[in-house]
Amino acid sequence: MYDVLPPELWVKIVDYSGEISLLLTNTSFFELFNLVNLKISVIKYVVENNLICVLKYLVLLKEIKHPIMDKTIMTTKSLNKFLIKSSKKGQLKIVECLVSLGADIKSLNNCALGLASENGHLEVVEYLVGQGANVRSNKNYAIIWASRNGHIEVVEYLVSQGANISAEDNLAIRWASQNGHLEVVKYLVSLNANIRADNDYAVRWASQNGHLEIVKYLVGQGANIRANDDYAVRWASINGHLEVVKYLVSQDADIRALDNSAVKCASRNGHLKVVEYLVSSGADITVENNCAIGLASRNGHLEVVKYLVAQGTDIRAENNYAIKLASLNGHLEVVKYLVSVGADIKADNNFSVSQGAILVN
């Protein structure tokens, strides 16, 4: 019934309703599409609505050299744009159709392959490589990002196709370690990736992010936990990763490096269990004029403050720095506790009192 409507009526109906899908009921879909006033391309509409049957029909029209394909119903730029988007989403059938319609798989430095790899779409990766995509393009982006996101099957496939696991100073294994992808890390090590690249970045960032099994594995492979002034144990402490801290200490990490930075920063961030463990292992809570309690007070970590006081820290150090910072930042319970154990609210010309009044007002 709809097929017998004149083109001008179709245009009016679609322009009024905004429903381009109505055109799909007409065999002259593409001709009508070019007549409506809605600002949208054929490819954009078809791809975004996952109309694979329409894409296949377009491929057929191209193969038989139908005159409609000579008209500007799609451009190479738009084909490339949606090839990249579809590759990122893992839409293999759409990717195949777009390539058949003339999309360039190597556009934007093989961006389609890079994004398909990054997001773990193995079938799309295999298809694009089969069509000539370069696995080493853009500084081996594909394998680096597949490793970063833990897509082991994609990593293995890219390696089989010649990807360089050592690119960008072994960035693949560094990022895999940072993000906790043990299987990828082990695989890359089996291919002789350098775990000590960039001043032992891999073990430092695995520690920082709390990936204990990766830390243990890297240490077993010869990683240096003492690199960069014991960065590993410092940042594991800062982020509250107690089990990682314990393991690193068992491997002779120096918890007092950089003037006891580990316990100071763990106190600052409120990681009570880490603070307790570090103190039991010999960390000094009194360094830098009892900086640890000042930082804990500033950030309102009452339980840490109580623990530090129990361990003999000086709450009146630096002219009652702790209560002044607690007052300045509005941590009433910390202020009350510090007062109860002898902090002087009148220190520094009644600084704490004045800050409390300001916050109340």
Swiss-Prot record:
Pfam family, one: Ank_2
SMART domains named in the record: ANK
Residue ranges crossing the lipid bilayer per the database entry: none
SUPFAM superfamilies per UniProt: Ankyrin repeat
Ranges occupied by ANK repeats: 77-107, 108-137, 138-167, 169-197, 198-227, 229-257, 258-287, 289-317, 318-347
Highest taxon above the source species: Viruses
Keywords tagged on the record: ANK repeat, Repeat
PANTHER family cross-referenced by the UniProt entry: ANKYRIN REPEAT PROTEIN, GH09064P
Protein name: Putative ankyrin repeat protein R901
Species name: Acanthamoeba polyphaga mimivirus
